[in-house]
Regions:
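An N-terminal assembly and electron-transfer interface module characteristic of large anaerobic redox
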Residues: 1-488
């Protein structure tokens, strides 16, 4: 007999929530039947894979599973770089799963108007269940097409909670096709991000001031430009899901991976950028080749470079702290005690953001988060002790399908004429949808922000969101916010 899951009854609240004082770490909510909200700005494996210029994606799985990825490719206008191989029942019964992948991929490559330099082959859950020999499959494909770089990718949601997540795997596969080449001590790479690092971010400002060449997959327009990333002496990641890929890249190509922890905390920002400065001075030496043909910098040049990095960092810190203090003052003067809701899609440290805002006088009421990131553990503990009534809400719990109908923001005057009309300010798309507010920050995955610039930009976006309404319906349903960078 079928039973209704979380049936909505008149006068009964079914929306799950927990005070942070009682929230477990890292999972404050029980796992079960899941709901997917219409807020679709975060990227999926199709979007991320399209970052490799000129590469072709081939998905091998059941027809039902193909619908979502096909729609993603169609919506972003990249169907010319996308193909599928459907697994049918007879393939399971006949035991020809390996042959299906090999021959299916080969047939697609043979029919393309031009052979791509790289092919990303996505196998799925069914290959995992049936014990398909993936090593043999890729060995055969590489024998047939030695001029093509193949990357083993996965559309395997059953592995979400064991080992590397699909997102971590996909970010690591972004750099598998890179060929080993001599390292250039004047070059660094920013890796593992869907969105480009902001030019005025503290990270980019530091690297530019140091005179280093910056490689980033989002700026590559050709496969050859993409291959130039392999010359980097340091790979810098600031998305936690990019860390496994950065470690793999360092092991394979020989550069050093440096994880720059994303933060809103002043002491942590200073500490993290101090560590990065040390890595740069140890691994990089931007000298002209004619000055020292044997490679590296003469000792006096190395000392000069280290001093340049230290001086640049000192300026960035001083300017950043001053800008942060002013931004807090200006934003708080506009927003006042307006309730604030944050969700995890905005940045890698949602509890870190909540802590920063609460400590600076903002009225943060809710954080939408299904699991708490490891980096947020100190913030979780701090908030439990200092702001125990902060409420945590899930985003995938089945009962959350009722959330947006329970929150209704007043219609009528804008914030410019009537501050009372802003019932809640949302930071992130899911918070905007669940709170049903027109006043929200429309950013995903940190938006390429780092350091003090991340703090000041976030505050500026909050002020703008308070003053100007947006259409939730029109904006949050756009799949893969910023994915137009993939259309080359």
């Amino acid at each position: 007999m079928l039973t209704r899951v979380n049936e909505k009854k008149t006068g009964e609240a079914v929306i799950p929530a927990v005070r942070i004082a009682e929230a477990g770490f890292p999972a404050p909510f029980r796992s079960g039947l899941e709901y997917s909200s219409p807020a679709r700005g975060t990227w999926n494996i199709v979007h991320t894979g399209m970052l490799i210029p000129e590469a072709h994606q081939i998905y091998v799985c059941g027809a039902g599973c193909l619908r979502g990825v096909v729609l993603t490719a169609a919506e972003m206008g990249t169907m010319d770089r996308f193909s599928t191989v459907a697994v049918r029942e007879n393939n399971l019964l006949d035991g020809d799963m390996e042959d299906l992948v090999i021959e299916g991929v080969s047939d697609i490559i043979g029919k393309l108007p031009k052979k791509p330099p790289a092919v990303l082959v996505f196998t799925s859950c069914i290959h995992h269940f049936t014990g398909v020999d993936l090593d043999m499959i890729y060995a055969r494909l590489r024998e047939r097409f030695p001029e093509i770089d193949f990357a083993d990718c996965y559309m395997n949601p059953i592995m979400r909670k064991s080992g590397l997540t699909p997102d971590q795997l996909m970010r690591s596969r972004l750099y598998m096709p890179l060929h080993e080449r001599p390292l250039n001590s004047s070059s660094v790479a920013i890796i593992g991000n869907d969105l480009a690092a902001q030019e005025d971010s503290d990270l980019v400002k530091l690297l530019r001031a140091a005179g280093l060449r910056i490689h980033e997959i989002t700026s590559c327009r050709t496969y050859e430009e993409y291959q130039e990333m392999a010359e980097s002496s340091v790979y810098i990641s600031y998305n936690p899901d990019a860390v496994p890929g950065g470690n793999m890249l360092a092991e394979r190509l020989g550069g050093r991976h440096h994880y720059l922890k994303f933060s809103f905390n002043e002491e942590e920002i200073d500490e993290e950028f101090g560590k990065l400065a040390e890595t740069l001075t140890e691994c990089c030496s931007p000298c002209e080749e004619e000055e020292n043909p044997s490679g590296g910098c003469p000792e006096n040049k190395a000392d000069s470079f280290a001093a340049r990095v230290r001086n640049a960092l000192s300026v960035i810190r001083a300017e950043g702290k001053a800008a942060e203090a002013q931004a807090v003052k200006d934003t708080l003067a506009v927003i006042g005690d307006t309730p604030v809701a944050i969700d995890y899609t905005f940045c890698p440290r949602p509890l870190g953001l909540a802590r920063f805002l609460l400590d600076n006088g903002f009225n943060v009421k809710k954080v939408y988060v299904d699991s708490i990131p490891a980096a947020d553990r100190p913030d979780h503990d701090y908030l439990q002790n200092n702001y125990p009534d902060l409420m945590l809400y899930p985003t995938v719990h089945a009962a959350m399908r009722f959330a947006s109908t329970e929150n209704t923001e007043g219609e009528g005057a804008s914030a410019d004429s009537d501050r009372e009309k802003v019932s809640v300010l949302a930071v992130g798309q899911k918070a905007a949808y669940f709170e049903n507010t027109k006043h929200f920050v429309n950013v995903v995955e940190g938006g390429g922000m780092t350091g003090y610039e991340a703090v000041t930009r976030t505050l500026g976006l909050m002020k703008d969101a308070y003053l100007h309404e947006k259409s939730v319906r029109d904006l949050v349903q756009v799949k893969g916010l910023g994915c137009e960078v993939c259309v080359r």
